């Protein structure tokens, strides 16, 4: 019996032994990370939610990577990753052979008008230029409008088949800031 804990800041998952009969009871018995051997950079950035397909395969939401790491439970190694075409996946769960993933920021066809351009026509003014690039003080109380545009995606829930790890469905119009399931 184990407890897997995501360490959002330290880019890892700690595996804690819950077997009261073992001397390692309530101790970290493994740390799951994924470091690129050449660059020495993490490929396991900001883990959040954890869900298990079964006793062999786990999923870990990597919020800043916009990916889900697929972890072999026995070896505790990342075997592949699933790309989430939305920002900051956090909430995940497995039910009936389906992996459900929700991103924290899903857009809902909206964008701050001061945000960077998507198609060159969405930004009513460039808040980055106004507040950051050309302003040597923090613009307290700076206000931007929210612009709705049909080309900005609205992707709220991603459904994967846990046997194939293939994306099988995307659901929209659930909300803008999605905190969990």
Task: Tell me the role of every PLM-derived stretch.
Residues 1, 35-53, 85-95, 174-181:
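Beta-rich, blade/repeat-based domains predominating
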Residues 2-5, 57-60, 99-101:
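Conserved beta-propeller blade signature
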Residues 18-21, 72-76, 161-165:
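Short loop/turn segments that connect beta-strands within beta-propeller blades
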Residues 24-40, 77-82, 166-171:
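A short beta-strand motif characteristic of beta-propeller blades
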Residues 76, 122-123, 147-162:
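Beta-propeller blade signature
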Residues 102-151:
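Short, conserved, GDST-rich strand-edge loop motifs in beta-rich repeat architectures
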């Amino acid at each position: 019996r184990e407890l897997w804990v995501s360490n959002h800041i330290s880019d890892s998952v700690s595996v804690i032994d819950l077997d009261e009969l073992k001397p390692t009871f309530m101790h970290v018995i493994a740390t799951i990370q994924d470091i690129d051997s050449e660059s020495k950079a993490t490929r396991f950035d900001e883990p959040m939610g954890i869900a298990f397909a079964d006793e062999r395969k786990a999923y870990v939401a990597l919020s800043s990577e916009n990916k889900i790491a697929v972890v072999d439970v026995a070896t505790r190694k990342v075997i592949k990753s699933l790309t989430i075409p939305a920002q900051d996946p956090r909430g995940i769960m497995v039910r009936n052979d389906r992996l459900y993933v929700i991103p924290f920021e899903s857009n809902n066809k909206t964008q701050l008008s001061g945000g960077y351009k998507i198609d060159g026509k969405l930004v009513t003014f460039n808040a980055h230029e106004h507040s950051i690039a050309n302003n040597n003080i923090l613009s307290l109380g700076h206000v931007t409008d929210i612009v709705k545009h049909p080309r900005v995606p609205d992707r709220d829930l991603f459904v994967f088949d846990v046997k194939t790890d293939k994306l099988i469905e995307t659901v929209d119009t659930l909300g803008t800031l999605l905190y969990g399931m």
